[in-house]
């Protein structure tokens, strides 16, 4: 249950960040366009895919909590912070190599519409993008760590 709650909160933080102009990054859209060029369907597919990822990561967090025989808000927050830094420093810069519809920084114009590459720390989507990603993922971890009871 807490995996679902933490994923909903993460999605809300990222969605609010985009809606309030903190970032231009639309994570469901970015993920959904991996599977379809249809921009309307991409958002729905991306939300589903991001929720599945959230549940998978929740299980990973639980496995780590169980192996450490402890869970706490600060430990979950630390894991969330590490996850966010990995997303920002590794996954987002690799998007042009992983995503069929993200152009790279060296490409010129193409006939097909391409998505802008996020760049290091997602800075191509705005200078405050790293802040929203760090806050969302750290909050995700805090919720899991605070409410998961190690048995």
Where do the PLM segments sit?
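Juxtamembrane/disordered regions of integral membrane proteins
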Residues: 1-151
């Amino acid at each position: 249950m807490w995996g679902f709650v933490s994923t909903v909160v993460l999605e809300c933080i990222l969605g609010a960040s985009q809606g309030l102009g903190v970032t231009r990054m639309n994570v469901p859209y970015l993920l959904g366009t991996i599977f379809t060029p249809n921009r309307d369907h991409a958002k729905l597919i991306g939300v589903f895919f991001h929720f599945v990822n959230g549940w998978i990561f929740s299980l990973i967090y639980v496995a780590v909590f169980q192996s450490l025989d402890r869970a706490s808000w600060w430990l979950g927050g630390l894991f969330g912070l590490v996850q966010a830094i990995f997303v920002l420093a590794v996954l987002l810069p690799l998007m042009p190599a992983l995503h069929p519809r993200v152009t790279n920084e060296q490409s010129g114009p193409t006939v097909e519409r391409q998505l802008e590459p996020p760049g290091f720390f997602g800075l191509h989507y705005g200078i405050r993008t790293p802040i929203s990603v760090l806050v969302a993922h750290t909050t995700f971890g805090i919720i899991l760590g605070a409410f998961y009871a190690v048995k």
